[in-house]
């Protein structure tokens, strides 16, 4: 995910023992490169990201988590699985801009064009 969206900020704290979760939409994606091939290493997240309201949530988009998250074999080979907690902290500029555009359209009484997330 961070390869394709450079404005996303990842947590990168020391990972704990909690396994990261993914939602149905993000299922079987590597959290670093978004590939769907050869899941290898289980993703561990830090204790702060695994506590409170973010518990059992998708580490990429924040939706309710369904399945465990895995790094792909290429990210494991490049040792990206040792860089720290891969949970996305901010939304990124494109989703933030979309939120305010949607709010502007609702206040004007119009329907928002395009896909709804």
Swiss-Prot record:
PANTHER family: PHD FINGER-LIKE DOMAIN-CONTAINING PROTEIN 5A. It comes from the Eukaryota. This is Pre-mRNA-splicing factor ini1. Required for pre-mRNA splicing. The gene is ini1. GO terms for biological process: mRNA cis splicing, via spliceosome; mRNA splicing, via spliceosome. GO terms for cellular component: cytosol; nucleus; precatalytic spliceosome; U2 snRNP. It is found in: Nucleus. Pfam families: PHF5 (PF03660). Keywords: mRNA processing, mRNA splicing, Nucleus, Spliceosome. Belongs to the PHF5 family.
């Amino acid at each position: 995910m961070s390869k394709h969206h450079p404005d996303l900020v990842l947590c990168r704290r020391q990972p704990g023992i909690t396994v990261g979760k993914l939602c149905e939409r993000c299922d079987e994606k590597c959290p670093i490169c978004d590939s769907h091939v050869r899941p290898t290493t289980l993703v561990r997240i830090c204790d702060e990201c695994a506590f409170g309201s973010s518990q059992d949530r998708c580490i990429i988009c924040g939706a309710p988590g369904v399945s465990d998250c895995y790094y792909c074999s290429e990210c494991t080979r490049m040792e990206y699985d040792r860089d720290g907690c891969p949970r996305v902290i901010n939304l990124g500029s494109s989703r933030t801009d979309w939120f305010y555009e949607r709010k502007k359209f609702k206040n004007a009484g119009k329907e928002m064009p395009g896909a709804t997330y």
